[in-house]
């Protein structure tokens, strides 16, 4: 959301000017350039339809030149977020989504405490583009 982006910019201070910030519906995003690093903190797990997931993969496959960093709800995470259905992933299932173009480098899970004092388990994975 725009509010989340603003909070992230505030945390980064002057360094925020070094980041390309984009607020968009990912399924309608039309990149006009390539990206060396793509960091998705919590978008991919909201894509539950095959068409949406495939569109996301088309975008990153076409416009990410080096590294892909993705945070999703793990298989031990919630089934819904903010009332919305989500997709859960483990390292293998997330890797299978991106392995034609990207190679999994690392994955780990981490508990995140929400502002409502609940715990959500996330999977964070880093990928590098295959030559």
List each model region and its residues.
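Class I (Rossmann-like) S-adenosyl-L-methionine-dependent methyltransferase catalytic domain
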Residues: 1-33, 50-131
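A conserved beta-strand element that flanks and buttresses the S-adenosyl-L-methionine
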Residues: 39
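Short catalytic micro-motifs in class I SAM-dependent methyltransferases
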Residues: 42-46
């Amino acid at each position: 959301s725009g509010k989340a982006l603003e909070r992230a910019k505030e945390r980064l201070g002057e360094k925020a000017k070094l980041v390309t910030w984009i607020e968009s519906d990912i399924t309608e995003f039309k990149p006009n350039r390539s990206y060396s690093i793509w960091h998705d903190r919590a978008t991919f797990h909201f894509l539950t339809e095959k068409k949406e997931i495939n569109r996301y993969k088309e975008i990153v496959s076409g416009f990410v030149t080096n590294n892909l960093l993705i945070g999703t709800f793990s298989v031990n995470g919630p089934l819904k977020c903010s009332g919305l259905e989500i997709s859960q992933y483990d390292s293998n299932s997330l890797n299978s989504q991106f392995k034609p173009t990207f190679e999994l480098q690392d994955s780990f899970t981490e508990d995140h405490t929400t502002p409502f004092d609940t715990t959500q388990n996330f999977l964070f994975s880093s990928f590098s583009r295959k030559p």
